[in-house]
Swiss-Prot record:
A cellular component term, taken from the record's GO annotations: plasma membrane
CDD domains registered for this protein in UniProt: ABC_MetN_methionine_transporter
Protein name from the UniProt record: Methionine import ATP-binding protein MetN
Gene that encodes the chain: metN
Functional note: Part of the ABC transporter complex MetNIQ involved in methionine import. Responsible for energy coupling to the transport system.
EC number: 7.4.2.11
Gene3D superfamilies, per database record: 3.30.70.260, P-loop containing nucleotide triphosphate hydrolases (3.40.50.300)
Amino acid sequence: MNEAIIQLDHIDITFRQKKRVIEAVKDVTVHINQGDIYGIVGYSGAGKSTLVRVINLLQAPTNGKITVDGDVTFDQGKIQLSANALRQKRRDTGMIFQHFNLMAQKTAKENVAFALRHSSLSKTEKEHKVIELLELVGLSERADNYPAQLSGGQKQRVAIARALANDPKILISDEATSALDPKTTKQILALLQELNRKLGLTIVMITHEMQIVKDICNRVAVMQNGVLIEEGSVLDIFSNPKEALTQKFITTATGIDEALEKINQQDIVKHLPANALLAQLKYAGTSTDEPLLNSIYRQFEVTANILYGNIEILDHIPVGDMIVVLEGQAENILAAEKALHEAGVDVSILKRGA
């Protein structure tokens, strides 16, 4: 089992502005293992960006303890390292942002080389390092181009190469794909996954989009008003969300909310017969492989009219959603619901026939 490379224990961050006290982060505990791609998701004002500054050691917490790669860096708001040791710890963390922050008058390779200006490498070693980094992010042929000659995705690749220049163990992505189109976003996420595998890089994804979490992360924390309200594996959170905000994020990411809007306009749903109901079925793992709807028809004479279906692969495990109209005798539908529950399917009744 991988050990935690980032440990935030009971972190409070409070700001004082004149007569106001702002509790930006309240009693947050997060442990991120080596090699994780860990998502922190929430709307604006949730405390995500403040938490980023704690993780990359730019913000001292008011209370709580921070341990990075085995070293306690802050405890009860007090720094535990020398200034030099803290600077070195900060170099162990790379950052990429929504805005690429490239220097317009420098080429791609010069932008990457700028991150090595304090390195002990020789000039030749730095040149080789820059070439290797641009190859790693798939941009070696654009080494001599200026930012104005690059697309948004290419600029972000330069920013990633620059963030990796000092061989960090941790990479923080703070809304790094928010300014990109969907196709380019997928390409950048695929690159980050590749870097995670190749380098053993621990990646922290700060985002307001659960779709990003679904596509790339293995664990996720959901924040609201400075509080961590839910945390777990992506599989557990998507298949069994507990909090209303988490459920809202997930229905948006999976397209269920949009599907329901359209389904509710269909005549079959507007005029459900008395012996029918509209239900959402959620299932994960082996239950996705079972012909359950055929089974409940054979056993209970309950028909299932599928109005929507979707299967995602999360952390190598299939997770599915279906919206169906179940029709049959009332006692048979109850028996079918029980059988579905026993097979590991979560059944939510959305509407009953009149």
